[in-house]
Amino acid sequence: MPREIITLQLGQCGNQIGFEFWKQLCAEHGISPEGIVEEFATEGTDRKDVFFYQADDEHYIPRAVLLDLEPRVIHSILNSSYAKLYNPENIYLSEHGGGAGNNWGRGFSQGEKIHEDIFDIIDREADGSDSLEGFVLCHSIAGGTGSGLGSYLLERLNDRYPKKLVQTYSVFPNQDEMSDVVVQPYNSLLTLKRLTQNADCVVVLDNTALNRIATDRLHIQNPSFSQINQLVSTIMSASTTTLRYPGYMNNDLIGLIASLIPTPRLHFLMTGYTPLTTDQSVASVRKTTVLDVMRRLLQPKNVMVSTGRDRQTNHCYIAILNIIQGEVDPTQVHKSLQRIRERKLANFIPWGPASIQVALSRKSPYLPSAHRVSGLMMANHTSISSLFESSCQQYDKLWKRGAFLEQFRKEDIFKDNFEEMHRSREVVQELIDEYHAATRPDYISWGTQEQ
């Protein structure tokens, strides 16, 4: 029984990565840009209906809702060769098209105004599913629409569909370069509060690390947005392969999430992928074995989140799930796991078992691949807290100077006071503290002392 997933794409970033994701899924399932199954796509072993549904004339339509407060990106999608793929009723552009002006408050209050229209679309999609498992939200936390409208939607989805899973692919801003959005630290922190309280699982896509990987590993001097988005769509499609090419394990979203998230608040995941090459010569000298792939996945340079060194805290893995695609002998997997444990290649939490799981998945038969084996690691690692710490530091700098607060005061939620900002700062601080506590053996009783 397929458990359907509805994808919500928000704002410029969310719609751009969503667009790449659907392009990738179409290629993997042998679906043309118009949604028609290609003649060569005869293998019936994949499950298309988790992410697509079939219209009356048999062509496939993504279970996707495209939302934006300004038209530029969605118009570019509608002028692309994939324009006919989407259901036009599932596209929502705000009437006045002014956008959220990179302001979380404006994005949030726009959400309140257009709430009815958006949920008409979402409810209709949900009613069209046989057994909806949950929602996947693509957005960035730095701008206005992805952060503000995204936060509003996360809160409402929890109220409206309390039993459905909500997973997000959240793009974190690049810390290495100056941002063109001056209020980004405010936007990020306000969104982080909702990601902590209203999402079941957050896959963190860190622009700093994605840029580093594109430059170091793919040898692209100044990576463009679309090149970074291709990296992201690789991660998104690989993390959903077990849902689309089901095996006997991890073939639904809860199965994926349950193995990675033992305690509810620590649900921010980092990803790693290998082999990442655009260089054909590397393919000819490297033999990709399961052990090779699994060992490379544990190397920091392949991980798509940049975390600083922390001398005070001995950061560790809470859980790892490796999704290995390709020609794989299961006995090899067992040997590789043993080797990783014997050599202590990964440092695990002191209060629970070393949870490293492997899901084997078929590759799409329709896409040529330069590598026999490729792997995606989804990991719950305590060092992700350093990303939240740098968000807090940037926020504190602005807050201390009272910078740019005027822009927020215009919105209803901040009209009388900035209580919402203080509360968000507290929630993120509690999250950081809990990640630090998870590195210690007494974490099991953590939190009971404070109540």
Swiss-Prot record:
A GO BP entry: cytoplasmic microtubule organization
Keyword list, A-Z: Cytoplasm, Cytoskeleton, GTP-binding, Microtubule, Nucleotide-binding, Phosphoprotein
A Pfam match: Tubulin
Residue positions binding GTP: 142-148
Major place of residence: cytoplasm
Record-annotated membrane-spanning stretches: none
InterPro entries: Gamma_tubulin (IPR002454), Tub_FtsZ_C (IPR008280), Tubulin (IPR000217), Tubulin/FtsZ-like_C (IPR037103), Tubulin/FtsZ_2-layer-sand-dom (IPR018316), Tubulin/FtsZ_GTPase_sf (IPR036525), Tubulin_C (IPR023123), Tubulin_CS (IPR017975)
Residues modified to Phosphoserine: 131
Cellular component terms (Gene Ontology): centrosome; cytoplasmic microtubule; gamma-tubulin complex; pericentriolar material; spindle microtubule
Superkingdom of this protein's organism: Eukaryota
Matches recorded under SUPFAM superfamilies: Tubulin C-terminal domain-like (SSF55307), Tubulin nucleotide-binding domain-like (SSF52490)
Intracellular or extracellular location(s): Cytoplasm, Cytoskeleton, Microtubule organizing center, Centrosome
Post-translation changes: Phosphorylation at Ser-131 by BRSK1 regulates centrosome duplication, possibly by mediating relocation of gamma-tubulin and its associated proteins from the cytoplasm to the centrosome.
Keyword Cytoplasm among UniProt keywords: yes
GO MF entry, a single one: GTP binding
Purpose: Tubulin is the major constituent of microtubules, protein filaments consisting of alpha- and beta-tubulin heterodimers. Gamma-tubulin is a key component of the gamma-tubulin ring complex (gTuRC) which mediates microtubule nucleation. The gTuRC regulates the minus-end nucleation of alpha-beta tubulin heterodimers that grow into microtubule protafilaments, a critical step in centrosome duplication and spindle formation.
Subunit-structure text: Component of the gamma-tubulin ring complex (gTuRC) consisting of TUBGCP2, TUBGCP3, TUBGCP4, TUBGCP5 and TUBGCP6 and gamma-tubulin TUBG1 or TUBG2. TUBGCP2, TUBGCP3, TUBGCP4, TUBGCP5 and TUBGCP6 assemble in a 5:5:2:1:1 stoichiometry; each is associated with a gamma-tubulin, thereby arranging 14 gamma-tubulins in a helical manner. Gamma-tubulin at the first position is blocked by TUBGCP3 at the last position, allowing 13 protafilaments to grow into a microtubule. Interacts with alpha-beta tubulin heterodimers; the interaction allows microtubules to nucleate from the gTuRC.
Family (UniProt): Belongs to the tubulin family.
Descriptive protein name: Tubulin gamma-2 chain
Source organism: Mus musculus (Mouse)
